[in-house]
Amino acid sequence: MDLRAGRFDGQMTDDAAQFSSSIEFDKRIFKSDIKCNRAHTTMLIEEGIIPKESGKKILKALDKLEKEGIGALNLDPSFEDIHMALEDYVTKEIGDEAGFMHTAKSRNDQVCTDIRLTLKEEIENTISNIKSFIKTIVEMAKENTHTLFIAYTHLQHAQPTTFAHHLMAYANELRRDCERLIDTYKRVDMNPLGSAALTTTGFPINRERTTELLGFSKVMDNSIDGVSSRDFAAEAIFDYAMLSTTLGKISDEIVIWSSYEFRMVECSNQYSSTSSIMPQKKNPDIAELSRGKSTIAYGELMTVLSMIKGIPHSYNRDLQEVTPHLWNAIDNTNDILRIVHGMLSTLTINKDRTEELAGANFATATELADVMVREKNLPFRTAHRIVGRVVSEAIDDNITTHDIDNDYVNRVSVEVMGKPINLGEDLVKQALNPLRNVKSRTVIGGCAPEAVNDAIEKMEIFLNE
């Protein structure tokens, strides 16, 4: 079948045909193209637009192709795209009657329909995989509500928390990634089929019927928009880029925590490698690669935004180049999601080390200041100055949190405000105890076991929706 025969004499040069062909990345939409042609042909038959017997032959050929798979197509670049390769197959099966299949349809609306159908499936799969990862995280959190952990700001000791509390931060980030995809899905789930080249068609087609057959939620309201819009693709890539960001942050923390200096976690051997020269090494290569690969979706997003920003309505061949970047962003991010899920779920927590760090380097200092406010009605800024001086002098005196007592705090408070604060030994020791710190954070979102358990319950409601 020669699409050029009516308008042109001769063929494209081989290099021009190869340059303009989308056959290779069109393989991704093969199944959707069959669905699209099947729905369109069914509608044409029902509306009496094409001969019923010809339509039945087309549908039979499409069913046969679906069973045989993409290997049955001639994927020569001279066909330009999967649509013409598919039409060539049907033509070889039933002859010229195959031409009825393209009645009231253009490749412009056909490819948009195929991309949307395929992207819907991709988003559904990713949402399912994110929820599976969140479920794993929630189960890990349930087991670690009392596992002391150190939280950082600026990668410096900040305050004690629990490993469960930190895990639930991951879960909530992933939930938002999931919700973004759910929201984007609404804008993908629209049917452009029937837009034809750009102004619809003079045939009395039934767009609501193809919408029903293809499982879309609505018909696109404007045919020019139907064939020219790729904002849904850019939006989806953004969602995958944000998901990559979450996964990259998790990977980054695994790299840091697994170092000898931190020794908070250990990666499974399944997700580690060694050195070709240093036999003692256990390197978090998979975490590092996940962190590095998490940037790929950013590049794909910028590429697609650049492609679609400066072209006029409606269809332009530039748009052909959007889809490989869309699929690459999706595939790469899904790979990272699968790897990080497995890596985190097999992580070993060094609980002795995390408990040690939770109480080290004056991480409980904030609670000491808070106790001064609660027990002595001291302005927080005054308490902040006293505790800051306590820490500074303790460092100068080469003592740790465990060595700070009521007398030490009184001496410093005299220096700061001219009188002892007299908290008492019990209050000072309780304030500086990391476990007591954690248990006092009972507000919504806090690190106390009951607060984390509440957060887990909320997350499980989301997972079951």
Swiss-Prot record:
Subcellular location: Cytoplasm
One Pfam family of this chain: ASL_C2
A single Gene Ontology CC term: cytosol
SUPFAM superfamilies xref list: L-aspartase-like
Keywords assigned by UniProt, alphabetized: Amino-acid biosynthesis, Arginine biosynthesis, Cytoplasm, Lyase
Catalytic activity, EC: 4.3.2.1
Reactions mediated catalytically: 2-(N(omega)-L-arginino)succinate = fumarate + L-arginine
Pathway stated in the Swiss-Prot or TrEMBL entry: Amino-acid biosynthesis; L-arginine biosynthesis; L-arginine from L-ornithine and carbamoyl phosphate: step 3/3
Gene Ontology molecular function: argininosuccinate lyase activity
Enzyme type, top EC level: lyase
CDD domains in alphabetical order: Argininosuccinate_lyase (cd01359)
InterPro entries (alphabetical): Arg_succ_lyase_C, Argininosuccinate_lyase, Fumarase/histidase_N, Fumarate_lyase_fam, Fumarate_lyase_N, L-Aspartase-like
Biological processes annotated in GO: arginine biosynthetic process via ornithine; L-arginine biosynthetic process
Family: Belongs to the lyase 1 family. Argininosuccinate lyase subfamily.
Listed name of the protein: Argininosuccinate lyase
Organism whose genome encodes this protein: Methanosphaera stadtmanae (strain ATCC 43021 / DSM 3091 / JCM 11832 / MCB-3)
